UniProtKB/Swiss-Prot annotation:
A ubiquinone binds at residue 193. It is a multi-pass membrane protein. GO terms for molecular function: metal ion binding; ubiquinol-cytochrome-c reductase activity. The gene is MT-CYB. It comes from Naja nivea (Cape cobra). Component of the ubiquinol-cytochrome c reductase complex (complex III or cytochrome b-c1 complex) that is part of the mitochondrial respiratory chain. The b-c1 complex mediates electron transfer from ubiquinol to cytochrome c. Contributes to the generation of a proton gradient across the mitochondrial membrane that is then used for ATP synthesis. The chain crosses the membrane at residues 25-45, 69-90, 105-125, 170-190, 218-238, 280-300, 312-332, 339-358. Binds 2 heme b groups non-covalently. This is Cytochrome b. CDD domains: cytochrome_b_C, Cytochrome_b_N.
Length: 372
């Protein structure tokens, strides 16, 4: 009887003994989701989805509701930590070749898209100046769709401009989407446990498995505690660290901010959108910046699953990480030289990773065969 079968017999979840800290971000994401759902529920009790009252209701929550400022800041800061964790989680998947478990990877990509939609709708709700203008710019991209664009935009807005029906439906969507995220997360976890977790070596773990509890459960608890400590440190000492100063002013359709930008976690996609001077081209590039992740399971050519023993692929991977950070930085700057050139160059390098990875896989296979 194998180690795995013995563990399953006693109802102990068998997990590879050598999975590293990078495998802890899934449980940290679950912690973030729980925090977001609880704080979001209490905020929804006091929030008013009306263009004349939304901004005032957020001020009322932070000033008058007991512990309202904690709920509001926890909700905003843990949204940022949610995206930090999910980007690390995706990067881990790319590095260790976890995308070869197709069902898990594709359900994870669907989760990412749903999460991004939820965060976008939530950013609009406080009805600050940047909320309003970010919503105007992003929803306006729908008009780039041939034939259907204008109809879709009018349908989403609930009129011919962003108005009261828009904020009502955005609130409804922001409320319902987390429950869809919970459902998708359950599917994601079920699909993962269908095959089991991979490990840093990219080899089969069946011969060397240990019970999830206590070994990995305590490791998960340690990382979740570290994240919550960081969350409360930001909450206590710099609660507005990740907020945009423009959002402290009420939305005014007659005054355009000097530089319209979404929250930091969307800046990489916004930077790619902004680097293309054509509306339809920019919109397609924005969609592809996330959707290109779905191509990874189908373009893997290397005989080795993980990048751990592939130095050339490692260089390419860390170039992608540096590119991601650079696009985020340039997108937070005004549209002027040298930021335009940097943004366009880094956008090309970003997509270059997904095109070059399969070619490099073939090259590495040839090199391995030559060495043998």
């Amino acid at each position: 009887m194998s180690n795995q079968h013995a563990l399953l017999m006693f109802n102990l979840l068998p997990v590879g003994s050598n999975i590293s800290t990078w495998w802890n971000f899934g449980s940290m994401l679950l912690t973030c989701l729980m925090l977001q759902t609880i704080t979001g529920f209490f905020l929804a009790l006091h929030y008013t989805a009306n263009i004349n009252l939304a901004f005032s209701s957020v001020i009322h929550i932070t000033r008058d509701v007991p512990y309202g400022w904690i709920m509001q800041n926890l909700h905003a800061i843990s949204a940022s930590l949610f995206f930090v964790c999910i980007y690390i989680h995706i990067a881990r998947g790319l590095y260790y070749g976890l995308y070869l478990n197709k069902e898990v990877w594709l359900s994870g990509t669907a989760l990412l898209i749903t999460l991004m939609a939820t965060a976008f709708f939530g950013y609009v709700l406080p009805w600050g100046q940047m909320s309003f203008w970010a919503a105007t710019v992003i929803t306006n991209l729908l008009t780039a769709i041939p034939y259907l664009g204008t109809t879709l935009t009018t349908w989403l807005w609930g009129g011919f401009s962003i108005n009261d029906p828009t904020i009502t439906r955005f609130f409804a969507l922001h409320f319902i989407l987390p429950f869809i995220i919970i459902s998708l997360s359950s599917i994601h976890i079920i699909l993962l446990h269908n095959e089991g977790s991979n490990n840093p070596l990219g080899t089969n773990s069946d011969i060397d498995k240990i019970p999830f509890h206590p070994y990995h459960s305590y490791k998960d608890m340690l990382m979740a505690t570290t994240m919550i400590t960081l969350l409360f440190l930001i909450l206590s000492f710099a609660p507005n660290l990740l907020n945009d100063p423009e959002n402290f002013s009420k939305a005014n359709p007659l005054v355009t901010p000097q530089h319209i930008k979404p929250e930091w976690y969307f800046l990489f996609a916004y930077g790619i959108l902004r680097s293309i001077p054509n509306k339809l081209g920019g919109t397609l590039a924005l969609i592809m910046s996330v959707m290109i992740l779905t191509t990874m399971p189908f373009t893997h050519t290397s005989h080795t699953r993980s990048m751990m023993f592939r130095p050339l692929s490692q260089i390419l991977f860390w170039t992608l990480i540096a590119t991601f950070i650079t696009i985020t930085w340039t997108a937070s700057k005004p549209v002027e030289p040298p930021f335009i050139t940097i943004s366009q160059t880094t956008s090309i390098i970003y997509f270059f990773f997904f095109i070059t990875t399969p070619l490099l896989g073939w090259a590495e296979n040839k090199m391995m065969m030559m060495n043998n």
